[in-house]
Amino acid sequence: MTYEKKAPFRANHVGSLLRPPELRQAREKREQGELSAAALREIEDRCIRDAVKMQEDVGMQGITDGEFRRTLWHADFLRQIEGVKVVEGLSPDSAKRFQNPDADVQRSPTQFVVTGKLHHAHGIEVDNFKFLASVTRQTPKQCIPSPSLVHFRSGRGGVDKTAYPEMSDFFADLAAVFRQEIAQLAAAGCTYLEIDDVNFAYLCDPKMREGVRKIGEDPDKLPALYASLINECIKDRPPDMAV
């Protein structure tokens, strides 16, 4: 059997791996002020090296860092966009119970609001990608959350009308932020980018569709809107970058 030399590969994985106990405990200590940022980074580095080895040992060609740098798969990225604010616990009715052994983990979805003009202040995942690339022999795959997540749970009501009287300007600036991040990742050597978007699946769920209507959005129109937004984000990617 021949194997692809260039992404996308026949066998792929999302790449968000279960955090090892050492990393979970270290993050808890960091949140409680008992561990420095530098010490946490060292533990993350070690756990990422182990995750990379595991993926390589089973024959994966596209290697991720397990998203071990993040507390939440999307919020840690999106909160670094200037003008975006993370708000948690706004929808108790939509709280989800996660299936841990005791079934006692429940949390409301994270929402995002736009408080001012959007700006890409710095490379968000660039340094993380560079570390991953330095510790794998295979193709490093970088995952970023979809831009649609900034809009999905809050809609027009979550976008400051002084900053953005017109939603078209908001979406244009949001796409520009992602283009800048993607350009910096490309400059760092990224040739395999994954954009994680759960909202297309959510829009197949009747309850989620009703929630979209409650915030004044049309669930039948959002798929095309979000597809156009993502296409705007990736339109300037280099020819050798697979998305």
Predicted regions and their residues:
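Domain-level signal for soluble alpha/beta catalytic cores
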Residues: 1-243
